A protein has these predicted regions:
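Catalytic cores of the polymerase beta-like nucleotidyltransferase superfamily
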Residues: 1-172
């Protein structure tokens, strides 16, 4: 019998709950359950009780990570790595607009502390299928910003005994 894993995030907020949810990064993190509905956690009516102004439940059902607003990566550039880590952990995909915004915001990664980059990057590396997520980081123009030493390996051919170029060989 599989039990449902829940994360309860208690957080103080100012303004309305809707304003607080609007400050979140991704739709799947921008949902709330009123404390008065606590007992609904184990109820079939749970989804009717959830405050979900950004359609996070739909995105959970579709296994999709979508930004709440187009400024989330400018507001906190560490989210550039968090979105990939979250996708890896949940086995979700990023929606095309989120992907476009992440790629466009990649230069902002230089504003993130080394500790935060290290923590998110190591989290990504610890996931099953990490190679695929390294390719996602590369597609988003983030991987060589984290490890600039990898950039010269792109397109470098190897002797015929090798199937991949140096870059792809490094990822495998």
């Amino acid at each position: 019998e599989k039990t449902q894993d829940w994360t309860i995030d208690l957080w103080g907020y100012s303004g309305t709950i809707e304003e607080d949810l609007a400050r979140r990064d991704f739709t799947i993190d921008a949902m709330a359950l009123p404390l008065s509905e606590w007992e609904a956690l184990d109820s079939p009516e749970l989804f009717e009780k959830v405050l979900d102004p950004f359609n996070g439940l739909r995105d959970v059902a579709q296994k999709c990570i979508r930004v709440v607003n187009p400024h989330v990566f400018q507001d906190d550039p560490a989210r550039l790595l968090r979105v990939v880590h979250l996708a890896a952990r949940l086995h979700f995909r990023m929606d095309p607009e989120t992907t476009r915004l992440a790629f466009q915001s990649a230069p902002l990664l230089s504003q993130v502390s080394g500790d935060r980059i290290r923590n998110e990057f190591l989290g990504i590396l610890s996931m099953d299928g990490a190679r695929g997520y390294l390719q996602v980081l590369d597609h988003l123009d983030l991987l060589c910003r984290i490890i600039p030493e990898l950039a010269p390996a792109k397109g470098v051919e190897q002797p015929k005994e090798h199937y991949w170029d140096v870059w792809d060989h490094s990822l495998h």
